[in-house]
Swiss-Prot record:
Keywords: Acetylation, Phosphoprotein
Comp. bias regions, Low complexity: 241-256
Native organism taxonomy: Eukaryota, Metazoa, Chordata, Craniata, Vertebrata
Name of the molecule in the record: Protein FAM53C
Annotated source species: Homo sapiens
Ranges where the record places region Disordered: 78-119, 141-167, 204-294, 341-364
Residues recorded as bearing Phosphoserine in the entry: 122, 162, 232, 234, 255, 273, 299
Positions where N-acetylmethionine occurs in the chain: 1
Family: Belongs to the FAM53 family.
């Protein structure tokens, strides 16, 4: 049977509806006797068209059959009969489905959200289309909303009148002492910040329960809240929330105040991109440090360092210049080599000592050394004072 129908569809002419390929699914009914609609498997001649199908009394083309035209084929969907019909009328479907369309003809998916949207703490718009109330994962920071009845003493109940009237809002936990309502006018209380409201038509005011500290919705409404659909961490809309509405442009005053911020930092504005302050500074000017006061070194007197004191050689030269043939008795004492050797280190050591001493003491010791050298040259070396040499 399926082979005959497939061959018949392939031999149709081009002036009729285009039917390239069909996947025909004909579920066989349990009862072979279907008298109301006649034979469910009917053969149509080759010259006949799909539009000339015999009319079925139990189904109407406008009510029960849905024609969906596709560029590559034709689909016929026959709705199953209702449950009130006789058990003989089993639901059957005659579906003619074409091949899946090309991926190029499929609608282009929407572009991914921008980077700014990904960074913001917002809920996508698709959540508003969900039928069940959206609740996040259990956390310490979030608590779900409990809907109370009109008396307020009944147990929590969720309204089931209509899906668009469901209210789903989440907020941070408050202290247990938060037992004020935003509906009465004599109790001015601002709606809580960081509340995530997800409502389409919310006609109930907001109230804070003393047990959980979360904002709830009462059945008693003094004035209906305006319709809202908010997906940001901003104040919830209440009957008197018009004064709490943020401006169109975000400002430091409109942003919520963090409760854990220190007291000194609560009035500080929000951080903005500050202009570069390097232009105000002078470029190319180096900071000159004050020169460190260097300690004054003692000045060295090179004339005094070059002066030679009286020594044995000086005494010998002076006596030779005078031309005296008779040498004094102290010259004979200075002539032996061992004594002259002992005389020369005294002059060298005294000269080294005079160069290493400071300027203040140098002048005093210079005179002492000169006097001692004269006394050394004038007296006999037999009675040399070793203590005097060590001091010099």
């Amino acid at each position: 049977m399926i082979t005959l129908i497939t061959e018949q569809l392939q031999k149709q002419t081009l002036d009729e509806l285009k039917c390239t390929r069909f996947s025909i699914s004909l579920p066989l009914p349990d009862h072979a006797d279907i008298s109301n609609c006649g034979n469910s498997f009917q053969l149509v001649s080759e010259g006949a068209s799909w539009r000339g199908l015999p009319h079925c009394s139990c189904a109407e083309f406008q009510d029960s059959l849905n024609f969906s035209y596709h560029p590559s084929g034709l689909s016929l969907h026959l709705r199953p009969p209702s449950r009130g019909n006789s058990p003989k009328e089993q639901p059957f479907s005659q579906v003619l489905r074409p091949e899946p369309p090309d991926p190029e003809k499929l609608p282009v998916p929407p572009a991914p959200p921008s980077k700014r949207h990904c960074r913001s703490l917002s809920v996508p718009v698709d959540l508003s289309r969900w039928q069940p109330v959206w609740r996040p994962a259990p956390s310490k920071l979030w608590t779900p909303i409990k809907h109370r009845g009109s008396g307020g003493g009944g147990g929590p109940q969720v309204p089931h009148q209509s899906p668009p009237k469901r209210v789903s809002s989440l907020r941070f936990l408050q202290a247990p002492s938060a037992s004020s309502q935003c509906a009465p006018a004599h109790r001015p209380y601002s709606p809580p910040f960081f509340s995530l409201a997800l409502a389409q038509d919310s006609s109930r005011p907001c109230a804070a329960s003393p047990q959980s500290g979360s904002w709830e919705s009462d059945a008693e409404s003094l004035s209906p809240c305006p319709p809202q659909r908010r997906f940001s961490l901003s104040p919830s809309l209440g009957p008197q929330a018009s004064r709490f509405l943020p401006s169109a442009r975000s400002s430091p005053a409109s942003s919520p105040e963090l409760p854990w911020r220190p007291r000194g930092l609560r009035n500080l504005p929000r951080s903005r991109s500050q202009p570069c302050d390097l232009d105000a500074r002078k470029t190319g000017v180096k900071r000159r440090h004050e020169e460190d006061p260097r300690r004054l070194r003692p000045s060295l007197d090179f004339d005094k360092m070059n002066q030679k004191p009286y020594s044995g050689g000086l005494c010998l030269q002076e006596t030779a210049r005078e031309g005296s043939s008779i040498s004094p008795p102290w010259f004979m004492a200075c002539s032996p080599p061992p004594l002259s050797a002992s005389c020369s280190p005294t002059g060298g050591s005294s000269q080294v000592l005079s160069e290493s001493e400071e300027e203040e003491e140098g002048a005093v010791r210079w005179g002492r050394q000169a006097l001692s050298k004269r006394t050394l040259c004038q007296r006999d070396f037999g009675d040399l004072d070793l203590n005097l040499i060590e001091e010099n």
